[in-house]
């Protein structure tokens, strides 16, 4: 085991769970962290240490001044509740409209989940489409990658809005009879170490292939090692999370 100590920003020390490789836990008092709070892990390993965003963080935001990414607690007092409980897509035929949330507007700026829901969905429905395929929206540090250099796999990109606003977009699409396909990226990940998984706990190959198979030449990114049970668990859990939560 490379990681020797893990804590939440020096404040709350985590402890390794006996007989559970790679599993660390911490018990916090009620109210210790609340909705909107920023947090990171501080990981110490043999020969070094670093602040890391938890791999399972479901909300990540970027400071407008420093440009630093941090995980954020997302537990709103009144979370969004889906109005359309059951949805069955019409597939005869399935007419798919591929879209990018940030580019789906006419001004020179990044669009939002709310703008897409209010302005674009009605036009898509009017054009006769019954399905949208949303290009990659998992959190990514570089907007120019179109979302394909993912750093936080469980977090919808905060540059487009909040998780609840994405839920409302999807719910609205379903109520309009429009199915939603999400383009998730599990073939590779961004190289970034501070924001991503590139060197999460002192082992640059924790999630990825070693040697010549590690880097994706076309994307300048890292390739997941599908031969590791922990990696498969991480990626399949990610699929389940998006299906269950959104």
Task: Label each residue range with its predicted role.
Residues 3-8:
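Short, small-residue-biased leader/transition segments that mark boundaries at the very start
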Residues 10, 37, 149:
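Residue-level signal for beta-strand positions within conserved beta-sheet cores that form or flank
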Residues 10-11, 83:
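Short structured motifs
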Residues 11-19:
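Short, surface-exposed loop motifs enriched in S/T, G, D/E and P with embedded aromatic residues
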Residues 18-98, 103-108, 115:
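The feature marks proteins involved in alpha-glucan
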Residues 61, 79, 83-91, 100-246:
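Substrate-binding/active-site clefts of carbohydrate-active enzymes
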């Amino acid at each position: 085991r490379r990681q020797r100590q893990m804590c939440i920003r020096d404040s709350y020390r985590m402890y390794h769970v006996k007989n559970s490789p790679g599993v660390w836990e911490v018990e916090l008092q009620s109210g210790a962290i609340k909705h909107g709070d920023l947090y990171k892990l501080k990981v110490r390993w043999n020969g070094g240490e670093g602040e890391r965003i938890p791999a399972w963080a479901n909300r990540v935001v970027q400071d407008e001044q420093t440009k630093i990414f941090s995980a954020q607690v997302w537990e709103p007092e009144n979370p969004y509740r889906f109005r359309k409980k059951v949805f069955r897509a019409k597939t005869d035929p399935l007419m798919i409209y591929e879209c990018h949330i940030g580019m789906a507007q006419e001004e020179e700026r990044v669009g939002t989940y709310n703008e897409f829901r209010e302005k674009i969905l009605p036009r898509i429905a009017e054009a006769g489409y019954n399905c949208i395929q949303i290009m990659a929206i998992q959190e990514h540090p570089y907007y120019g990658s179109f979302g394909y250099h993912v750093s936080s796999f469980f977090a919808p990109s905060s540059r487009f809005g909040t998780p609840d606003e994405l839920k409302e977009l999807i719910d609205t699409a379903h109520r309009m009879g429009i199915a939603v396909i999400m383009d998730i990226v599990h073939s590779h990940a961004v190289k970034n170490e501070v924001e991503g998984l590139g060197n999460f706990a002192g082992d640059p190959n924790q999630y990825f292939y070693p040697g010549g198979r590690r880097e994706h030449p076309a994307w300048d990114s890292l390739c997941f090692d599908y031969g590791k049970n922990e990696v498969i668990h991480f990626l399949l859990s990610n699929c389940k999370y998006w299906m269950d939560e959104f």
